[in-house]
Amino acid sequence: MADQIPLYPVRSAAAVAAANRKRAAYFSSAGPGPGADRPSRYQLEDESAHLDEMPLMMSEEGFENDESDYHTLPRARITRRKRGLEWFVCGGWKFLCTSCCDWLINICQRKRELKARTVWLGCPEKCEEKHPRNSIKNQKYNIFTFIPGVLYEQFKFFLNLYFLIVSCSQFVPALKIGYLYTYWAPLGFVLAVTIMREAVDEFRRFQRDKEVNSQLYSKLTVRGKVQVKSSDIQVGDLIIVEKNQRIPSDMVFLRTSEKAGSCFIRTDQLDGETDWKLKVAVSCTQRLPALGDLFSINAYVYAQKPQLDIHSFEGTFTREDSDPPVHESLSIENTLWASTVVASGTVIGVVIYTGKETRSVMNTSNPKNKVGLLDLELNQLTKALFLALVALSVVMVTLQGFAGPWYRSLFRFLLLFSYIIPISLRVNLDMGKAAYGWMIMRDEHIPGTVVRTSTIPEELGRLVYLLTDKTGTLTQNEMVFKRLHLGTVSYGTDTMDEIQNHLVNAYTQTQCQAGGSSAASTPPRKAPSSAPKVRRSVSSRVHEAVKAVALCHNVTPVYEARGAAGETEVAEADQDFSDDNRTYQASSPDEVALVQWTESVGLTLVSRDLTSMQLRTPGGQILTYCILQTFPFTSESKRMGVIVRDESTAEITFYMKGADVAMASIVQYNDWLEEECGNMAREGLRTLVVAKRALTEEQYQDFESRYNQAKLSLHDRTLKVAAVVESLEREMELLCLTGVEDQLQADVRPTLEMLRNAGIKIWMLTGDKLETATCIAKSSHLVSRTQDTHVFRPVTSRGEAHLELNAFRRKHDCALVISGDSLEVCLKYYEHEFVELACQCPAVVCCRCSPTQKAHIVKLLQQHTGRRTCAIGDGGNDVSMIQAADCGIGIEGKEGRQASLAADFSITRFKHVGRLLMVHGRSSYKRSAALGQFVMHRGLIISTMQAVFSSVFYFASVPLYQGFLMVGYATVYTMFPVFSLVLDQDVKPEMAMLYPELYKDLTKGRSLSFKTFLVWVLISIYQGGILMFGALVLFESEFVHVVAISFTALVLTELLMVALTVRTWHWLMVVAQLLSLGCYVASLAFLNEYFDVAFITTVTFVWKVSAITVVSCLPLYVLKYLKRKLSPPSYSKLSS
């Protein structure tokens, strides 16, 4: 029976059958047409459709439908067709207005089409088109648009616009109520704070932009070097960049002071990677005798149009004044992108892109303006308050009998009750958010934490899904070599000394053979038995494997010079290579780990430049290899290779290493590679397959000519180059399989356990292979070892996805492991169903995920579940995911600071996530919920008093309190105690960490909901009525006594309500209470205009105020006591 349950439960079997009959009738009634000879869709159905399995969406559909088929579209796209009057009234008008405005803006600011260009060296005047200025501008406004822009940003929100209209209405004599400053002072304070904050931020941006744009660079001209500002650099200029200087624009690398014709650059501010990148100068210009000779040649660079991809470039360098003309292909290794830093030597480049066309600017996207769920909920409540305001005003006018100009009375009542919507709500919440951020950064238990987005700290307390990267986030990104497998023998960490012995034996025999052949000595004696032959065979294989690992990489040893200059340079062959200050630079930690391992077993990389590398054997002999070609690693090919020539033997060898999925079809047939890759992956090791192929001189010469020709192609260069390289990647000899371990970070297991107990579902999104990702998920206890795991089989069609989803549907409480390719197919056809099933899993592991897929998964969870998501990562490939999530957390790791800088919160260790969420996230949400509701209570209670007062006095639209009383009530009299609620806590941080189940209650939003809001409304109505009626009943003769009694009781009631709300007292809370009370008592002496000073000093005044205050507050204290006794909250059991 389980097989017959449809995955999409809304459609019953009868409904499906009815739909089948309707569609069959439709197709049969359509009659023959142009496609009559084509079989129907029912005839195209897979045989699998006749299984007992019910289909996921439409049982009558064939699996192999056209992509444009309506029924295969995601539901999010289908629902867009349902637009009508209801859609327009409920918000569709906003969408239409926004679309029209965007259309007009696009028409007015039409982007210039980007084109390829020809750039002549040192001749910017030859540029055929005008290019953007090379200036950086991060400012949002200029001197003319600052005030209008800031005001627009404030008043585009309904509430701020409402307060502006209310304040402006006081200029109309017929609508004026009290003093102008009663309304303009709070609004002016909010605007002044906002304008000052924006002005400071804008001035800082201006200073940063000015500093960058004013940096001086040396520009090479016919007359020599001249100093030029960065903002004045043009396309075609020859710019000289010194060591440790930022590259001002995108350039082609022409010359360097380094003898090797290459230099290192740091790209951490561009791609987030901390490893240095090797860049190569154009050989034609590097060979010129002098720097000034650049103007004696007639040369140009052809560059492709500006693009986003920072890892690719296609262009050509042409020198026309030589015979024949020189043509060199240009690739990414010949470029110097803006915002990178020269790490060695001095470089000269020709500018090809400036300003907005540089790679760094084009990849700088404006992240979405994140709005917290609490802010959205408060916005809904304020809309409800506005409706209550309008309803109350209409009721008052109705009871008044619409006498006289009723519309004027209606507007005056709207003004009188305007305090229902407190203008101080936004100010208090913003100040509270700033306080939460300060507390987070001051927490000694999570040192180094930085709050970069101060507007969403409450989001940390409402998370349901946590999406995390693996490498560098759950793991340390510190690679340690653990395993070498040769097929018949495997070496681990405890047997590395055997590899060292094999290397010593191999190189000793090589030296003896070389010495014996040169001296024409007697031939070597044969081995006495077969055992030595086996040992020599193993030694030879180990030697070949280690040598391949030591040669096939992109690692460069760098030595810090001890001289006065203190510059970093590559060691030469005649240097002392035993220097302790040697470091390895590479594009990946895996590469460094492999080279460090070969050094540990005796084969050391001591030198490398563009054309050669040198190895030192265990016996101290230096081996020199000429680098003929290098094929760097790409995410598409998943492998890298190098062709080298042994200088001593003239042998040419092609070495290659890569992922098993890429290398399996390249190496010769074997029966152990797939099995051992799986075994290593289950141990949590990152595997690489190493292979080689010997080449003859003729073979290499033929390859080189075809390779160089392909590199000069202007169209489809990448494909043509890949095709030529693939011609070599055939029947390669499998040498070994390496295993590198990426160790888990400290306290990852207890942190994940804590998050799981808090009700947070954790998804791991990684670009690593399936086996490794699964192993890390189990070793980190993301997936418990006793928990079932469903590995989603690779699917490529809709039918396969259908069957696999049905197989997954029958499993319960199991973790899901799926690859990025299979995920893409499932989302194409069954987006809603897949997300619905995946969200039911306790854990999900997505492997082989691209950065865009990571961000897409985050958006899918937001769209289909409506729950709050958090993304955490440490690399540049996690930035899109972090920015797409409701709350982004970046870890400062070995892959750089790009993720950290793009995140809302930055931490140094994954284990800090636990305290960040359980303590600070939980406290921030509960504090802001209490603060927001209390501020609304403060406005509701005084509006209730105004309503009672107006009702008693024949519905007159006369204010109860005027002038400074209203301003003081919203500020000095109650602001400090109310704001002190940001220090409140229901449980101690240690208890919140010990019992993460407390966090689970927050996801239900019970601390701030319409239920709690209605409770506060009832409290406000009760207290406002008691205060006003009590004052009216107890006053004797003068009306001013009513104001004195009611207002004093109101202030005391607010202070007592804060005390009632507080759960854990802080000394600053006591100070705030006493300070506010002291300010009010002291101000009584100066409020002769509002109070009778002689009356407020009498005992009668004191007992009347005390009686009214007790009646308004005592029942609430009793109710709170009874609730704690009869139905205590979960946290009270722990705090007691």
From Swiss-Prot:
The chain crosses the membrane at residues 146-166, 175-195, 384-404, 409-429, 940-960, 963-983, 1013-1033, 1042-1062, 1067-1087, 1099-1119. PROSITE patterns: ATPASE_E1_E2 (PS00154). It is an enzyme of class 7 (translocase). Residues 1-145, 196-383, 430-939, 984-1012, 1063-1066, 1120-1136 are cytoplasmic. One of its GO terms (cellular component) is perinuclear region of cytoplasm. ATP binds at residues 469-471, 591, 633, 638, 657, 686-687, 766-768, 848, 854, 877-878. Its EC number is 7.6.2.1. Keywords: ATP-binding, Golgi apparatus, Lipid transport, Magnesium, Membrane, Metal-binding, Nucleotide-binding, Translocase, Transmembrane, Transmembrane helix, Transport. Belongs to the cation transport ATPase (P-type) (TC 3.A.3) family. Type IV subfamily. This is Probable phospholipid-transporting ATPase IIB. It comes from Bos taurus.
